[in-house]
């Protein structure tokens, strides 16, 4: 976990600075989505992005590690997308003719429990990091439709100039049956 990066890479100060930088990036991303600044959000995604959210199943005790989540490339998932498909989703929403987003939802992203699991080549000179976080996304539609999405994300971020780009995001939604009428939220 975060201690492993600190010990392996030689210093709490470097880890703390890296973690703060990553948190700032994730919080900025959440703000862009909440403010519907989708074009700027898309700029945070790498061209080779993999954006994946498996479907979860209820399984017998002891089988959850192997069978609870669908596997990418096998079966179905809520999302198995790249930057191009996310760009098309954004374009569709911005037409104003998207039935599930007209009028636009009010969204609030909360990101917490950020942990830098790995930094390559080191915390001091990180070019790529693996980050785990928790999220809560509140969605309000029309007058009285409200939905909560809760779960965890594992992101791989790549250094790009003075910031980061998301190259992989795996989203684990902590529900096996979608409670919302549609899934137009970006996580």
Each language-model region and where it sits:
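Short beta-strand edge/turn micro-motifs at domain boundaries
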Residues: 2, 124-132, 149-182
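Short, low-complexity N-terminal intrinsically disordered segments enriched in polar/charged residues
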Residues: 2-47, 59
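Short solvent-exposed loop/turn micro-motifs enriched in small/polar/acidic residues
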Residues: 24, 107-109, 149-150
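Short beta-strand segments enriched in hydrophobic/aromatic residues
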Residues: 45, 135-137, 170
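A solvent-exposed, acidic/Ser-Thr-rich amphipathic alpha-helical stretch
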Residues: 47-119, 125-131
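Charged, gly/pro-rich active-site loop segments
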Residues: 110, 126-127, 138-140, 153
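Short, cysteine-centered beta-strand-loop-beta hairpins and adjacent loop/turn segments enriched
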Residues: 137-147
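Short hydrophobic/aromatic patches at helix-to-coil boundaries
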Residues: 184-187
């Amino acid at each position: 976990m975060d201690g492993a990066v600190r010990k392996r890479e030689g210093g709490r100060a470097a880890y703390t600075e890296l973690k703060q930088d990553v948190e700032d990036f994730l919080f900025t991303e959440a703000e862009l989505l909440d403010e519907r600044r989708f074009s700027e959000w898309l700029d945070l995604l790498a061209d080779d992005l993999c954006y994946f959210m498996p479907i979860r199943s209820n399984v017998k005790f002891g089988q959850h590690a192997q069978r609870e989540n669908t596997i990418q490339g096998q079966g179905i998932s809520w999302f198995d997308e790249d930057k191009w498909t996310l760009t098309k989703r954004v374009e569709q929403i911005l037409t104003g003719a998207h039935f599930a987003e007209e009028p636009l939802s009010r969204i609030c992203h909360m990101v917490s429990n950020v942990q830098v699991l790995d930094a390559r080549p080191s915390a001091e000179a990180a070019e790529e990091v693996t980050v785990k976080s928790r999220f809560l996304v509140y969605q309000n539609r029309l007058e009285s439709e409200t939905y909560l999405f809760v779960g965890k994300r594992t992101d791989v971020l790549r250094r790009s100039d003075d910031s980061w780009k998301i190259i992989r995001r795996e989203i684990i939604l902590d529900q096996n049956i979608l409670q919302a009428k549609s899934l137009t939220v970006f996580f």
